[in-house]
């Protein structure tokens, strides 16, 4: 198995561990590498080029986990979302991976 296959296998394992069958996040990972995998998946809920008011960001994130403030902060701090004056937009993450 090459390193790309191994990385994909580890990523899928993290997603299975932290998301339930309905696509809800069971817990926010404490380990940074695992949290990045989870945040990448959450960032896919946002369309590149679209601007989102905070209320819409909260709605989209609440469908995944109740701690929307923590998720917003992590997404911004890790470069998956940008934020200015209460408006958010996608700045990173995987684009072609199905949600």
Where are these regions (language model features)?
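Short amphipathic alpha-helical interaction segments
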Residues: 64-74
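A short, conserved structural fragment
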Residues: 77-88
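Short, cationic-aromatic polyanion-contact patches
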Residues: 87-99
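Short acidic, hydrophobic short linear motifs in intrinsically disordered regions
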Residues: 48-61
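Eukaryotic partner-binding/assembly regions in large regulatory complexes
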Residues: 1-3
């Amino acid at each position: 198995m090459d390193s790309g296959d191994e990385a994909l296998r580890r990523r899928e394992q993290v997603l299975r561990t932290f998301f339930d069958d309905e696509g809800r996040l069971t817990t926010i990972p404490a380990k940074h590498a695992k949290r990045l995998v989870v945040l990448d998946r959450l960032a896919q809920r946002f369309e590149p080029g679209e601007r989102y008011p905070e209320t819409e960001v909260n709605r989209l994130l609440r469908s995944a986990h109740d701690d929307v403030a923590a998720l917003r902060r992590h997404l911004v701090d890790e470069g998956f979302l940008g934020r200015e004056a209460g408006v958010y937009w996608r700045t990173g993450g995987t684009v072609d991976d199905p949600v």
